[in-house]
Amino acid sequence: MGTNGTTCPGPMKATSNGVFQGENPLEHALPLLILQICIVLLLTRLLAFLLRPLRQPRVIAEIVGGILLGPSALGKSTKFINTVFPPKSLTVLDTLANLGLIFFLFLVGLELDPKSLKRTGKRALSIALAGITLPFVLGIGTSFALRSSIADGASKAPFLVFMGVALSITAFPVLARILAEIKLLTTDIGKIALSAAAVNDVAAWILLALAVALSGEGSSPLTSLWVFLSGCGFVLFCIFVVQPGIKLIAKRCPEGEPVNELYVCCTLGIVLAASFVTDFIGIHALFGAFVIGVIFPKEGNFANALVEKVEDLVSGLFLPLYFVSSGLKTNVATIQGAQSWGLLVLVIFNACFGKIIGTVLVSLYCKVPLDQSLALGFLMNTKGLVELIVLNIGKDRGVLNDQIFAIMVLMAIFTTFMTTPLVLAVYKPGKSLTKADYKNRTVEETNRSNKPLCLMFCFQSIMNIPTIVNLIEASRGINRKENLSVYAMHLMELSERSSAILMAHKVRRNGLPFWNKDKSENNSSSSDMVVVAFEAFRRLSRVSVRPMTAISPMATIHEDICQSAERKKTAMVILPFHKHVRLDRTWETTRNDYRWINKKVMEESPCSVAILVDRGLGGTTRVASSDFSLTITVLFFGGNDDREALAFAVRMAEHPGISLTVVRFIPSDEFKPENVRIEITEDQLCSGATRLIDIEAITELKAKIKEKESSRSNSDSESHIIYEEKIVKCYEEVIEVIKEYSKSNLFLVGKSPEGSVASGINVRSDTPELGPIGNLLTESESVSTVASVLVVQQYIASRPVGISKNVTTEESLVEDSESP
């Protein structure tokens, strides 16, 4: 109701009739809301782009963007604030922002698996408790200083609890994002940080519920008790009544099948109903959505499907509105005078001191190294959206005034902003191994030293698994177990849309805190099909495949591959080609980013690298089957890469189901290279030393064939290895020879073959990473084959960075690499 000297703004109509009928669209709710959303998205995305080189999470850009649109910056202009964010429009903006926040808190609850808290190690639990207790105590101490100065009149008990929660909270979604950005998500320190943050999150929400119950306007202690007890009753009702119903829905959503739209609508309806109940009780509506997320079953397909459907709309559209709604309440200008700025420094110091010192001391007591302890302290000091939620609830309930609210928002920005640079400064994992530590960087060296072969297979999706399994089976040699070590790395993109819950689901196979490790058959059937496939292979072949996960932006995921290869002392990394074969046998690009990854790994890998051009190697998976057989052909021209391909093929030939043919090309005296070609350089011609090593490799191969023939003299079986020499006069004869072996299952070729025959081959191609022979077998119409191709590059410490010199490119790889 209006009073003398004041007027209440009238309600806004939803839509306008347009400017041509004399109406201003900005005086109507819908067009004004659209303008607000566009401005918010444009500003926050621009700030996120500017902060990307500093490796800051997007939440920093969104908080700063909200502040810039508020009274601290652009909002100082009366014309701007009355035009774009007039007071009468804020109810619609706040309602839409809080609706999105309800669903975001549901996603936050989905991140937490209560079962994982039971399995949290003593070390992570101790670190979490220390990271809560000391900051909470310091927060209470800080609140006394604030109440005696700038917060005089604030309710004592609610103010103490709100300040304690604000200083002790760790923003789990932001922490997960930062860990992934700095490549610590799957490390030991990342596991400890996530486990501790999970415990911290649960404790913080319980304390927040208590603070909300205490902060009712004019409420008596008895009323606060009723609110708190009603909240406890709501949680019990959700656990014993709502959760069984949701589990029934989840069981009706089997893995690999689309989720029924009705189930999604029912679940979102349950989230809204729970929010209504908690708001009706007197606890904030967000609490109900969070509880539903916590009790939601994490196994199976349903949780992932919900995240996929809700994530983009919530994080991309609704959440930035909440940051603006918060920024409109933040006025940095209220922090005036030495006293106020001194209190800001005090709040920041206590927030950092409590979290960092508490975490570091307990970590050192748990025998965590000093650099990791410091990194954990900085990581646990991460604030973010959850911090803003606590502060906004406190301000809306009158517990925090404008000045304290601004101080706490600046504290949240500062502590989060400093996390990444400080962690990178104190913790530098992944030191390169010395040559003495890591000797067998190639298959050729491994065979020579008679050591177990270590391979790393990278894959993009389950589509790659059958071929990988068949290639592993072919590589196991005679002794199935001790002579082969295999790592399978799943390449997953960390994109802008990846929420913490998606990342948690992606890395749960590595044993992070939100993975149900129950090994029952029911859980196994609903777990990741990739892990199931490798587990089945292990049981049948007795070759252990260790799953790994790389979660990074496409522009830097090659660093994960190279670092993992060095850490595991791998002899060869095998990468999938960036194209796949369609049913009509034509090539289709899976994703051009994978081509960039292959190029960068070839340049920076600490071991040999191979690119697998898959045309369905061996058909369907036939592990440990008596009819497992592959016909493999090595096209040998000479040089380091060809010898590495030969060494890998000889290793495969130890398998009883493998038939290997080695074809060596020898130029005749009148050999003529192809007419259209580029200049031949010395790098393409075998040096005398290289030629001698090639001859030695061929001599060893002949001796091996002779040994096999003598060992089989008492049987009618033939040798599995055939060596042939082909004397060629020109490029066309090379093509004709290759055609003779077009029915092979697999070709092994070097990326950069050497010698006069190889130097005479000129192939125009847009995939120079395959080399001339790989391109000939893959994309040239001269050779028609359905065989898969493995293009091998041997590790050489002094290998120059760049593409193969005997491939004429029609487009530059560097241009393609600009997109990631």
Swiss-Prot record:
Keyword Cell inner membrane: no
Induction of the gene: Up-regulated by NaCl, K(+) starvation and abscisic acid (ABA). Induced at acidic external pH.
One BP annotation, GO: regulation of pH
Entry membrane topology: Multi-pass membrane protein
Gene Ontology CC annotation, any one: membrane
Stored Pfam families: CHX17_2nd (PF23256), CHX17_C (PF23259), Na_H_Exchanger (PF00999)
Molecular-function GO term, any one: antiporter activity
Keyword list, A-Z: Antiport, Ion transport, Membrane, Phosphoprotein, Potassium, Potassium transport, Transmembrane, Transmembrane helix, Transport
Gene3D superfamilies: 1.20.1530.20
Family statement: Belongs to the monovalent cation:proton antiporter 2 (CPA2) transporter (TC 2.A.37) family. CHX (TC 2.A.37.4) subfamily.
Other comment: Could complement the kha1 deletion phenotypes in S.cerevisiae.
The protein's name: Cation/H(+) antiporter 17
Protein source organism: Arabidopsis thaliana
Name of the encoding gene: CHX17
